[in-house]
């Protein structure tokens, strides 16, 4: 039976599965902080396809594999034939025969979807123009670590300030899946599309919580437990000049001390990073005591560990002692015969 599962869109996962991955990631994190690196990915190899530059995603994925006994290969743009001389289908089938798991950060979501369709091993979406699921899991893990006293996730409200980037969309997907109230505080023309919002509303209907889109700062920030923002000009924004975008977002949608003061007194600030200091967020907020961005960045690795172990767990069938001894003896004999033949 084919047990392959991809991590391309968290909407294909249940709340129970997400909760399991959060707990798995935190347990592995606890184990490593106490000095034990569980070999949960021993002898497993991750291939990483990057059509874009990356700091947090690449380093967290490589470190996650290494710490758990596996290995990661970086496949840079121009070094592999992905949709160039060779079709995505063919490249994916080849990589699926050589690697144990594939991660891909791509320009277009359909690319990672195709890799997932044709590769016979699990495929992880390291970010596309549609969503950023590994960021989602790291973020929700960080929220669990910083829950307000006496609250659970389903009691919390999160506000995403600014543009409806793929991180905004992903934040809505994940938080509504966990029963939270989600608000996008952003200008018209930069709000989430209706079909995307509908997914969040379906989650809210099933799990509780709500989805709100508003241009009213007071309405958005009232009783917020978490406030999140992203850059105003990102990897996929090339249709409007940067200066024009800045004029739309600044100063109303900048996360500063004045805006944060409208939230609850225990509010936490989040950012997927990299941040453009002085634009979408001030230094005062980013470096404040209520900023949890560095924990959030660290939990990218926590999330990667959980995702890789969860997806690869069905294939972790290690040989029995008897089988290992059988092959050790056969290899020893074959290598001895090879040496003898060279010496004759």
From Swiss-Prot:
Keywords: Cytoplasm, Polyamine biosynthesis, Transferase. GO terms for biological process: arginine biosynthetic process via ornithine; citrulline biosynthetic process; putrescine biosynthetic process from arginine via N-carbamoylputrescine. Disulfide bonds: none annotated. Signal peptide: none annotated. One of its GO terms (cellular component) is cytoplasm. One of its GO terms (molecular function) is amino acid binding. Coiled coil: none annotated. Belongs to the aspartate/ornithine carbamoyltransferase superfamily. PTCase family. This is Putrescine carbamoyltransferase. It comes from Pediococcus pentosaceus (strain ATCC 25745 / CCUG 21536 / LMG 10740 / 183-1w). The gene is ptcA.
